[in-house]
Amino acid sequence: MKRGFAINREIKIVLVGPPSSGKTTIKKVFFEMANPLKLLEHPLKPTKGFSSSIYSFFNWKIGIFDLAGQENNFWFNKEIDIFNNSNMIICVLDIFNKISSLKKFIYEVLDIISSLNLKNCKFYIFLHKIDLVNQSYSKSLLKYLEKSLEKKIKINQNIKIFKTSIAEEYFFHSFKIIYKILTVICNDNLIQMKETELKNLEIELSIILRCKYEIKYYNQDVANYFKINANELKSHLRRLETLKFIESLVFEPFAFHLTNRANWFKIGLKSEMEKIAKDKFKLGIEIMHAFLNLNEVYGII
């Protein structure tokens, strides 16, 4: 996919931010279903230049350009054209950075949006790694930035700020943010699904909710519990493997266990206190439905 494109049903997203802010990690965890715990324990090496990846998402193609933070002066000046035709710019900021640095970076990106006349480009700011600070600080920082950008936001409704993290206590929250961003930018009613797909997802989410983390489950026992045959269960487990929610056991191919992704997803879903149980179940189904339809087509490093 070219650097600049504006063809119908093609979406261009640019990830930008200071060095080591977590841009690539977010892409890996939510777009490529990487293990968040592994990436927390073994952080990725810094991106050099830029990496581009293309994903299919229902009837859309999403191109993501991940820009190396060490080369921001280059992107903001000589190579500013890499932002051309962007449908969305996601600015990932390490919440530990100085507030003055955060503001400066945000305004630099806003200047690019203005200079390239990206009127319809959505600008989403991620205050990332919020698990490493107390909640009162993250809330006060969010309010401060919203107040600082108040005039800009009134003029441009496409500007939004989110608090994100790939850590356990915020994993589902961030998953939900990415889900909402995808559904908004594609401007489609992606929630609608066939009755058969809804039933499949109900079983698959029920498997996640019923199973306990780090416990071994035999396929036949699970099939008996849900009153489905072995082939039907195999299909459900294959889909859950696509989401990296389960892993088959190497020496016991007819058994599986939940991954930490599934466990963190389940913990977050259950903690959605503002919704009644039925709505929580529906939200889980909608998110799984969306991400089962997100697939990497190819990537260029």
Task: State the predicted function of each range.
Residues M1-H42, W60:
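Conserved G1/Walker A P-loop phosphate-binding module
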Residues N59-F76:
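Switch II (G3) loop of P-loop NTPases
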Residues F74-K98, I112-S115:
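Inter-motif core of Ras-like GTPase G domains
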Residues S86-Y107, D131-Y137:
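Conserved Switch II/interswitch segment of TRAFAC-class P-loop GTPases
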Residues V133-K194:
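Canonical P-loop GTPase G-domain recognition
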Residues M193-Y225, G284-Y298:
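Short amphipathic alpha-helical interface segments
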Residues K227-L243:
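Short amphipathic alpha-helical interaction segments
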Residues N260-Y298:
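Short, amphipathic alpha-helical interaction segments positioned at domain boundaries
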